[in-house]
């Protein structure tokens, strides 16, 4: 616990699991827990509030764990039924934290108090009293710079989240953490003479003594045993001996080490019985390890619904590499299949270890109703084939099981039905609807072929999946619709964003790997238009940081492209109002500089319109715009989000949210709020290293010997892209 003399403040994290099943999981999920937090007003801001952990002072002359336990009970009495308070299982010291400011040199301790599993008990809301919050919701918005939390509370919550993640990997730790305390287990044992009927019961109210029949009835009520068997010999004077069916003596015992050259493998009939017993053990183990698979196999809808509510995964493969939906389709369990697809959101094209799909199993078994359910699913791949290249129709006609004629008819009719479509947007807001011939199995490569672009143009672009604050380039073999389905999980893995506010869409965008030397040779007007739309979008959003003169030139080119040639009567001084400036000037310059640029923009616009040496054809103007953008350091970059820490004073650090841009030129950091370019490093002039758990990466500039660390969940993606793009460059390009 460190030096107790330095510890005054005790912070308490009261946590409870939402369900008992999560305690046995080796995978940590923050959404499986709730945490007790206070809300207090922010100083000087009456309406705004921040969340803090429970806090108390440690009394040097008292027993610490008992004091904290009593404090939790006292604090939670107003919100609990009958003012009983919340009595934790135990008090565990997690970590100590150094204090800052006036309390430098002292420490605060974070104690964890595990509570009972969440039940239907209604806790009343009382102003000024703590309430339970979902831990996942808290961690999504928790950072040391967040105004929603006290700084020390934020640090402690982040440490708690990491601590729980680590402890879930340790066998039996989490169940032991939430196990009733030894004193509670003794008091609630019915054979204890001082049996407590309720937890927290006062010692003077304990019932003293039970008869054997009363103990039996209590045990039946508490343990819910199917049968209760008395030992008839217990307490009697009868003599008894152990009865055995057979005694086998090892004839080789005591004869020394055997001659292994003479050992023979027994015949198969001699070990057949032993092998069958092993099979039985495996079957019993399968039932215990995969309850969702068993309920799907048996068509137990009630159990299936309950397990899905407890967040059992529909994608988990068992020891035979089958998912629950494979069993439901194999055994013809119609309702189980429907529940897994609708409630469990199971992928209808999920493959087992032998690359067979649910549709293969349903068709092979002649389960026409399940075939119909699968074919009606918008993401189904009607043309899916197994490891031997067989379609569901081939399997159906080979096996001829049950109602196979109806199943075959449905499969044949489905081939000619119109396909579902997906919208692929461009950066100007337009889109093309592309047929999904393989449902959610349709790959990026297949979608690109459906975009009706020439083979040459296709190589410059690819599909991106983007929401408001996260954009990812997909690879040719990726399946975009499955990424759309999994977007909440992807967001949770790579960001702290709220998935409810991030709606993913698919975009046709420039391939970040496209070399500038190749782009400069592009002549196709459609390719130039798509590149122009994306460059214009990034310019207006402030991602292209450049000198004022460059931004004014780009603005004049946009005026020529949008409004045509300059007309003195039409394009007067007042023409460039705030609304028109929005379409030609970066948002970061709109209020600070744009009003002072209007004369210079109009002047360049006029010169451009009257210049005879400049072609006024649209794709030539768009190419001129791109030529000016090529000189900007961040052109063509993929942007990630992160944080860097700078020293605001000797005692504390300032957190700066940043965009991390990676392109064919190098790495660039932009201030997230102002879009100011903080640093720009070319390949060959800096080194990088991925941090622990892919949570950060370190950059070292070889020119000015400067090093800094960027903290981001996207660190792994950033480093992979740096390695990829740096590897594309020739040594001469890297050093130029």
From Swiss-Prot:
A GO BP entry: cell redox homeostasis
Location relative to the cell: Cytoplasm, Cytoskeleton; Cell membrane; Cell junction
GO molecular function: microtubule binding; phosphatidylinositol-4,5-bisphosphate binding
SMART domains: ANK, B41
A GO cellular component entry from the record: cell-cell junction
InterPro entries with a match to the protein in the record: Ankyrin_rpt (IPR002110), Ankyrin_rpt-contain_sf (IPR036770), ARM_KRIT1 (IPR056485), Band_41_domain (IPR019749), FERM/acyl-CoA-bd_prot_sf (IPR014352), FERM_2 (IPR035963), FERM_central (IPR019748), FERM_domain (IPR000299)
Region (Interaction with ITGB1BP1): 172-195
Region feature Interaction with RAP1B, mapped onto this chain: 430-452
Keywords of this entry: Angiogenesis, ANK repeat, Cell junction, Cell membrane, Cytoplasm, Cytoskeleton, Membrane, Repeat
Membrane topology, from the record: Peripheral membrane protein
Location of the FERM domain: 420-734
UniProt comment concerning the protein's domains: The FERM domain mediates binding to RAP1A and RAP1B and is necessary for binding to phosphatidylinositol 4,5-bisphosphate (PIP2). The N-terminal domain has structural similarity to the nudix hydrolase domain, despite the absence of a nudix box and low sequence similarity with nudix hydrolase domains. The N-terminus and the C-terminus part associate together via the NPAY binding motif and adopt a lose conformation that is disrupted by ITGB1BP1, but not by RAP1A.
Self-association state and partner proteins as the record states: Found in a complex, at least composed of ITGB1BP1, KRIT1 and RAP1A. Interacts (via C-terminus FERM domain) with RAP1A (active GTP-bound form preferentially); the interaction does not induce the opening conformation of KRIT1. Interacts (via N-terminus NPXY motif) with ITGB1BP1; the interaction induces the opening conformation of KRIT1 and competes with ITGB1 for ITGB1BP1 interaction. Associates (via N-terminus and C-terminus regions) with microtubules; the interaction is inhibited in presence of ITGB1BP1 and active GTP-bound RAP1A. Interacts (via FERM domain) with RAP1B. Interacts with CDH5.
Role of this protein: Component of the CCM signaling pathway which is a crucial regulator of heart and vessel formation and integrity. Negative regulator of angiogenesis. Inhibits endothelial proliferation, apoptosis, migration, lumen formation and sprouting angiogenesis in primary endothelial cells. Promotes AKT phosphorylation in a NOTCH-dependent and independent manner, and inhibits ERK1/2 phosphorylation indirectly through activation of the DELTA-NOTCH cascade.
Name this protein carries in UniProt: Krev interaction trapped protein 1
């Amino acid at each position: 616990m460190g030096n107790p003399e330095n510890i005054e403040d005790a912070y308490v994290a009261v946590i409870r699991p939402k369900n008992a099943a999560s305690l046995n999981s080796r995978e940590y999920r923050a959404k499986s827990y709730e945490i007790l937090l206070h809300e207090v007003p922010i100083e000087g801001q009456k309406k705004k509030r921040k969340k803090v952990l429970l806090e108390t002072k440690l009394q040097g002359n008292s027993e610490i764990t008992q004091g904290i336990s009593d404090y939790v009970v006292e604090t939670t009495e107003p919100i609990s039924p009958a003012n009983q308070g919340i009595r934790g299982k135990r008090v565990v010291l997690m970590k100590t934290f150094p204090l800052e400011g006036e309390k430098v040199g002292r420490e605060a301790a974070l104690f964890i108090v595990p509570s009972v599993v969440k039940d239907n008990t209604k806790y009343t809301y009382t102003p000024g009293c703590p309430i339970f919050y979902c831990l996942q919701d808290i961690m999504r918005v928790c950072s040391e710079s967040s105004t929603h939390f006290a700084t020390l509370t934020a640090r402690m919550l982040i440490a708690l989240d990491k601590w729980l993640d680590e402890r879930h990997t340790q066998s039996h730790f989490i169940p032991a953490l939430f196990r009733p305390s030894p004193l509670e287990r003794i008091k609630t044992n019915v054979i204890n003479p001082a049996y407590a009927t309720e937890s927290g019961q006062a010692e003077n109210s304990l019932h003293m003594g039970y008869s054997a029949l009363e103990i039996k009835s209590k045990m039946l009520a508490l343990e819910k045993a199917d049968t209760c068997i008395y030992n008839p010999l217990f307490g009697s004077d009868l003599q008894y001996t152990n009865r055995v069916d057979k005694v086998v003596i090892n004839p080789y015992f005591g004869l020394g080490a055997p001659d292994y050259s003479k050992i023979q493998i027994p015949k198969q009939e001699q070990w057949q019985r032993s092998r069958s017993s092993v099979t039985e053990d495996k079957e019993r183990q399968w039932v215990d390890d995969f309850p969702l698979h068993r309920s799907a196999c048996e068509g137990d809808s009630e159990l299936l619904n309950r397990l899905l509510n407890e967040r059992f995964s529909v994608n988990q493969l068992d020891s035979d590499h089958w998912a629950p939906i494979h069993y439901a389709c194999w055994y013809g369990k119609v309702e189980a299949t429907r529940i897994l697809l609708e409630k469990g959101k199971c992928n209808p094209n999920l493959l087992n270890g032998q690359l067979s799909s649910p549709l293969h199993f349903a068709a092979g078994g002649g389960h026409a109703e399940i075939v119909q359910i699968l074919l009606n699913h918008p993401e189904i791949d009607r043309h899916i084939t197994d490891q031997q290249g067989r379609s569901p129709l081939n399997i159906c006609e080979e096996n001829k099981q049950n109602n196979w004629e109806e199943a075959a008819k449905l499969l044949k009719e489905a081939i000619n039905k119109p396909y579902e479509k997906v919208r692929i947007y461009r950066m100007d807001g337009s889109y093309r609807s592309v047929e999904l011939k393989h449902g959610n199995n349709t790959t990026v490569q297949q979608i690109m072929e459906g975009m009706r672009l020439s083979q040459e143009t296709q190589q410059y672009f690819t599909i991106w999946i983007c929401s408001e604050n996260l954009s990812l380039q997909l690879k040719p073999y990726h399946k975009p619709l499955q990424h759309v389905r999994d977007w909440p999980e992807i967001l949770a893995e790579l960001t702290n964003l709220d998935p409810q506010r991030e709606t993913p869409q698919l975009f046709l965008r420039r391939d970040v790997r496209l070399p500038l030397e190749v782009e400069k040779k592009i002549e196709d007007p459609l390719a130039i238009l798509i590149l122009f739309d994306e460059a214009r979008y990034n310019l207006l959003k402030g991602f292209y940081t450049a000198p004022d003169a460059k931004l004014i030139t780009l603005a004049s080119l946009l005026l020529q492209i949008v409004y045509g040639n300059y007309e003195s009567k039409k394009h007067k001084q007042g023409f460039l109002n705030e609304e028109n400036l929005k379409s030609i000037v970066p948002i970061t310059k709109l209020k600070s500089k744009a009003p002072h640029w209007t004369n210079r923009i109009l002047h360049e616009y006029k010169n451009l319109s009257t210049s005879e040496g400049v072609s006024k054809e649209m794709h030539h103007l768009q190419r001129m715009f791109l030529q000016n953008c090529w000189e900007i350091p961040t052109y063509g970059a993929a942007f990630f989000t992160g944080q860097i820490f700078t020293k605001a004073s000797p005692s504390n650090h300032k957190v700066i949210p940043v965009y991390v841009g990676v392109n064919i030129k190098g790495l660039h950091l932009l201030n997230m709020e102002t879009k100011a370019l903080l640093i720009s490093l070319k390949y060959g002039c800096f080194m990088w290293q991925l941090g622990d758990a892919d949570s950060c990466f370190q950059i070292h500039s070889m020119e000015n010997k400067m090093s800094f660390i960027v903290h981001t969940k996207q660190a792994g993606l950033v480093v992979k892209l740096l390695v990829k793009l740096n590897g594309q460059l020739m040594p001469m390009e890297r050093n130029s």
